Amino acid sequence: MSLSDPIANFLTSIRNGQLSMNKVIVVSYSYVIHAILQILLSEGYIDGFTEKSKGSNIKFFEVKLKYYNGAPVISQIARISKPGKRCYCSAKDMPKFYNGLGLYIISTSKGIMSDYNARKSGVGGEILCGVF
């Protein structure tokens, strides 16, 4: 497991956890992952998350995955901007993910937010991932 792209590792952990119908997954700690988890929680894609620690300096998150009628709530989660090819957009040119049914998570100068909030605030940025 390479940590050259921790966001991709995090998204893959969610995808694999839901494919194997796990209720809880463990992901590494970072401020970016914390912000993404807060967005996923506020939009209703996960049931919750808690920050835990092992020893004095090893932190991680326990994420409760959400299911509806036995099927995962997140049907697709994908990394858009990658370390080798960054993807930026302005507030005017920001696309809608699945015609507004899904959401993009954007890293802006005002913090990490959903595409709806970025459009509302009038800021663009790097498109981190898409969730549907």
Curated annotation (Swiss-Prot):
Q: Which Pfam families match?
A: Ribosomal_S8
Q: What PROSITE patterns has UniProt attached to this entry?
A: RIBOSOMAL_S8
GO cellular component terms, alphabetically, are: ribonucleoprotein complex; ribosome
What Gene3D superfamilies is this protein classified in?
Answer: 3.30.1370.30, 3.30.1490.10
**Quaternary context:** Part of the 30S ribosomal subunit. Contacts proteins S5 and S12.
Q: Which NCBIfam families match?
A: PRK00136.1 (NF001109)
Instruction: Summarize the protein's role.
Output: One of the primary rRNA binding proteins, it binds directly to 16S rRNA central domain where it helps coordinate assembly of the platform of the 30S subunit.
Which organism encodes this protein? Answer: Ehrlichia chaffeensis (strain ATCC CRL-10679 / Arkansas)
Q: What is this protein called?
A: Small ribosomal subunit protein uS8
Q: Is Transcription regulation found in the keyword set?
A: no
* InterPro entries per UniProt: Ribosomal_uS8 (IPR000630), Ribosomal_uS8_CS (IPR047863), Ribosomal_uS8_sf (IPR035987)
Q: Into which family does the record put it? A: Belongs to the universal ribosomal protein uS8 family.
Assigned keywords, A-Z: Ribonucleoprotein, Ribosomal protein, RNA-binding, rRNA-binding
Q: Name one GO molecular function term.
A: structural constituent of ribosome
* GO BP, one annotated term: translation
